């Protein structure tokens, strides 16, 4: 991920001082924070532990982030930014909707395999119980992708590729839920075991089989008969 440029509005949870330190140091702090939050959750993650593993002082961390929440949200950005960029690029292309969906499924599987800890953090985000933090996370994480998916559905309806008797927002919500579940099923222990129970012990060696069946399911639900 390129952190050489200042964070935009979407990545606005760190202090300017964080962007003034070397990129390698920023990467180390956030990599450590991602692991700590992914495996311990927001409440149990320890700032002292993060500082120690990142080889910075606790005081320095608070020079970079006002609160633990700000560090958490910046870590979420760090974890999901690359995936969001890839998915948005696919969604905003001029390709047919079903081609876009196939690419999104492939990206979800490949990214989850290569970035298990990042997806574990995403899973932790979705199970957070602190109401104020949940609202902030949902608005922060879902706002861009929800609009991109909704636009893709509307464009598909206009082009006659997607049936028009389905609300675009609901269709986008269901597609995003499916993609999110795919990511968890290739990275998070419980979801992996659940996936094997439903699809067979060898499902992780049958990517094309999985992609084909997921697409068949989506097409049956969304594809226009025109």
Q: For each predicted feature, which ranges?
A:
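Short amphipathic alpha-helical elements of helix-turn-helix/winged-helix folds
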Residues: 32-36, 111
